[in-house]
């Protein structure tokens, strides 16, 4: 389109029906042909308005339209172009909508004989981004807001008004108990591994360096039976090697639209994993439209088959509702709408805090500890789940990983450095260790699964590094942490100075104090006498100060 316009060719009827694409081969894109040229005009130079008008009739979801516009301009689009495109597309939508009144008989006849091969409604388009292992954003913020049901919003608000005060009162009680009880860390820190795009045996080799931690595997509806079988075989291997395994069940939009296919998927997975898993998380990120769940009713439809399947597989425990981020109003609503006959054995949640930077940073007065306490309070107050809380997915996205970062644009513009949420590998490791002990040792979270072992944009190991797979510093940090504290018992949080954290752990023959200083440097005095000190990756040190990166002080 850009080449056509730069050549002075103004199409004036550029809808999808007037484009022909030939398939590409071996990574080389095919040819693009524009047809039906009888309305065209030749210009010395197209105006911004004329360029925008050629975008008006494109039938493409708003999320991908943004990518197309970025690719077209290779820079920030001019304001005039965006303004004219928005106006032209609004006028064209009205023209399409008014067809019902302009051609009532033709519209009625067409509605009586729907075309099964016709275009998919934009709201039902669902595309997988294998680079970031997540669903792609197909709708922009305006369309997502427009498609949200007011009735659904009222349901959420009503549930929060009904249950929110009880959860708030329980939160106040829970917060007083932070770091007040002993916590055995054995089996509490898990790792997610990939079964689709990466060498599974190679991942197991690195996993052994971390001991025998719990492992999370995904089964995704869109993958198909061949991949489900492959994942099930990998699960068998983990089970035989002594790993506790948790399974996450991922839906797509088709799961909502084709309930029988979804039920068959659930039957296959539960049959293959019965007796081999500790927990099954039902559905995924149900408070995000891009994951195919648009309303609470959609979520209920996905859960209904589990009510009967639960009777067939009484050994399997289920967790949910698997919402993401600090959007607990949706957690409360999703729990309340859980079908009768299905009570969760744990509240599982994707508690990301990466957009705030360090885990101690506040969001509306809530740091990670406060967010975990409120999540625990919701679990305690709900009669639809057990009091156990699992963070089934968390990480920080990494700098300089481009389109592999889960928070970066799928089509970066020239000179764009990436989203400001991305962090360095050093900070990734520091934040990970701090997040783990804050959530677990506070007593509010029972288990955390790190997402994930290997991923260029967000993993402990970089599979795209020159020279082969590279263990990032975060991997070495976690390896040393688990070797030192993986089977230790948290005893107490020592009072030191503001923003200085000192958590004490008991081992069989000694104690370990893990320390760091959030947002500054602490130079002492040290809260304990120690016989040895180590940095975050296990190097012996003579500490004169401690900053963002945790250190370990051992005492006899």
Residue ranges, per PLM feature:
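Catalytic domains of carbohydrate-active enzymes, especially glycoside hydrolases
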Residues: 163-166, 182-224, 234-237, 244-246
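Carbohydrate-binding surface patches
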Residues: 495-529, 536
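Substrate-binding cleft of secreted/luminal carbohydrate-active enzymes
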Residues: 119-140, 277-278, 394, 414-459
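Glycan-recognition and catalytic regions of carbohydrate-active enzymes
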Residues: 442-447, 451-509
């Amino acid at each position: 389109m850009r080449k056509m316009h730069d050549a002075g060719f103004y199409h004036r009827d550029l809808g999808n029906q007037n484009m022909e694409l030939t398939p590409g081969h071996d990574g080389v894109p095919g040819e693009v042909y524009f047809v039906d040229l009888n309305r065209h005009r030749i210009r010395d130079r197209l105006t911004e308005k004329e360029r925008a008008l050629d975008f008006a009739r494109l039938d493409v979801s708003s999320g991908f339209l943004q990518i197309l516009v970025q690719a077209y301009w290779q820079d920030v689009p001019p304001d005039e172009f965006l303004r004219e495109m928005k106006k032209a597309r609004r006028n064209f939508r009205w023209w399409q909508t008014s067809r019902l009144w302009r051609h009532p008989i033709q519209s009625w006849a067409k509605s009586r004989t729907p075309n099964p091969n016709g275009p998919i409604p934009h709201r039902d388009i669902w595309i997988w981004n294998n680079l970031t292992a997540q669903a792609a954003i197909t709708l922009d913020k305006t369309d997502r807001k427009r498609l949200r049901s007011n009735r659904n919003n009222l349901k959420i608000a009503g549930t929060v008004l009904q249950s929110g005060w009880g959860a708030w009162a329980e939160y106040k009680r829970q917060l007083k108990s932070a770091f007040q009880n002993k916590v055995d860390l054995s089996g509490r820190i898990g790792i997610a591994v990939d079964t689709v795009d990466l060498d599974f045996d190679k991942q197991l080799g690195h996993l052994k360096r971390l001991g025998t931690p719990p492992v999370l595997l995904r089964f995704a509806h869109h993958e198909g039976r061949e991949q489900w079988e492959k994942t099930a075989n990998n699960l068998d291997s983990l089970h035989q090697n002594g790993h506790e395994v948790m399974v996450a069940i991922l839906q797509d939009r088709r799961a909502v639209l084709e309930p029988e296919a979804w039920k068959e998927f659930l039957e296959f997975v539960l049959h293959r994993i019965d007796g081999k898993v500790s927990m099954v998380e039902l559905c995924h990120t149900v408070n995000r439209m891009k994951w195919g769940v648009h309303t609470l009713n959609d979520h209920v439809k996905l859960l209904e088959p589990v009510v009967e399947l639960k009777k067939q597989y009484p050994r399997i425990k289920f967790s949910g509702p698997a919402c993401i981020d600090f959007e607990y109003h949706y957690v409360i609503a999703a729990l309340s709408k859980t079908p009768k006959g299905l009570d969760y054995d744990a509240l599982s949640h994707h508690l990301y805090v990466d957009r705030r930077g360090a885990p101690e940073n506040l969001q509306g007065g809530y740091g990670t500890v406060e967010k975990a306490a409120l999540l625990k309070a919701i679990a305690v107050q709900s009669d639809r789940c057990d009091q156990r809380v699992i963070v089934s997915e968390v990480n920080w996205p990494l700098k300089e990983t481009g389109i592999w970062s889960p928070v970066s644009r799928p089509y970066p513009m020239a000179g764009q450095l990436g989203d400001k949420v991305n962090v360095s590998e050093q900070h990734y490791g520091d934040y990970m260790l701090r997040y783990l002990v804050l959530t677990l040792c506070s007593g509010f979270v029972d288990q955390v699964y790190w997402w994930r072992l290997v991923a260029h944009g967000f993993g402990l190991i970089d599979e795209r590094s020159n020279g082969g797979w590279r263990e990032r510093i975060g991997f070495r940090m976690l390896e040393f942490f688990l070797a030192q504290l993986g089977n230790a018992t948290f005893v107490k949080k020592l009072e030191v100075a503001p923003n200085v954290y000192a958590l004490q752990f008991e081992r069989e023959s000694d104690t370990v104090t893990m320390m760091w200083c959030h947002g500054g440097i602490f130079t002492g005095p040290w809260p304990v006498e120690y016989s040895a000190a180590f940095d975050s990756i296990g190097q012996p040190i003579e500490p004169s100060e401690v900053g963002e990166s945790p250190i370990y002080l051992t005492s006899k």
